[in-house]
Amino acid sequence: MGQDWDIIITNKSKLLSLDLHEVWRYRDLLAMYVKRDIITFYKQTILGPLWFIIQPVFTTIMFMFVFGGIAGISTDGIPQAVFYLAGLVCWNYFQDCLSKCSDTFNANQAIFGKVYFPRLVVPLSIVISNLIKMGIQFALFLVVYSYYFATGINFQINAALLLVPILIVMLGGLGLGFGMIISSMTTKYRDLRFLITFGVQLWMYATPVIYPLSVMKETYPKYIWVLVANPLTAILETFKYAFTGVGEFNWLYLGYSFSFTIIILLLGIVIFNRVQRNFMDVI
């Protein structure tokens, strides 16, 4: 008696293959991973999901005290709470996507070796679960933003607000792309796992999170190319400009960041697909 098979496992001959049809077929598994990531974050904690808000609030206060108060770094006339929180919302999303995606193979080697499913489900679930976390922090930003707006701060809201969803997708794409590349490399070079946290921290200081790009142009004009080459610079500057009307909004810089995101994402997919074929033999 013949049998009908719903799922056929075939050899992945194409390196540049998203296998989105397979990901969609396993959408229930994707949803389960997203739920697991969120629950795991605050499981057995007293405050639970409130940590999504507490972390950016206390970090913003620290930035206001250290960089705004002691160091006296300008925020281009933007209220410090709005300026720092805007940068943190974007940076935290990118950082979380990068850090967690970079541990995909090592953290899931047990299940990868036993059960078949499209491996892309795991890093995608990380990006989606962190998007939910970012949504909560973005709501916090809007509350703080609305407070200052109600007190008479003249924010110059503009059409760049329409780009905010694209900016968020770019942040997730960069985190996913870099994360897949690093995760693939750590299957052979375990030392990279210890460098990720340190490297990401340094990267934040090369990104206009605690300072505006205009200040760096005035203070260190010879080294501004380092910040411009950072694909996150245009994203954060455009995000701040969209809500305040202050910042460096440049279509050329933004186009560079968009192109960089596409390239890193495609490169990450190629390397990820290449490594997933035989990573169990390596690990």
Question: Where are the regions a protein language model picked out?
Answer:
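Hydrophobic transmembrane alpha-helices and immediately adjacent juxtamembrane helices
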Residues: M1-I283
